[in-house]
Amino acid sequence: MKFTKGYWMNRPGVENADCVQIREIKVQRNRVYLYAVPYAHDTRAMGGPVLELFLSSPKTDIIRIQAFHFMGSAKKDPRFEIELEDLPLNVEEFEGGLAIRSGKTELKITKNPASFTFYYEGKKLTNIGDRFGHAMISTLQTPEGPFM
């Protein structure tokens, strides 16, 4: 990728599949599973990879997001132990999205277009979402292979 015209542009041979819409949400006590696709229209059933986003709270005030595409079963290196308390999440669904809380941290997610906004003690920290038509979470297909 290169940076020109005020935003990142793909080099020749690089295709990206952006996280545009969250199609499905599964809520459990300690985890939230999001399944995102690279298209915005509900009538479309195919046309790109599905990104799996797993949300959990390893410690109070922390919301962990893991993104996967073709998780597979092979063990990846390097590996290291992470201290996880696996705390329950406070999840509140609303029209068009959901809010997830862990202690004083809150994550508000909208489904279409997909966006993620982080708050701490009610103050906005950062957000990830659709900017200038380019999503901030995506998979890349390059001549060297797939990347995320």
What are these regions (language model features)?
Residues 1-148:
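N-terminal accessory segment at the very beginning of proteins
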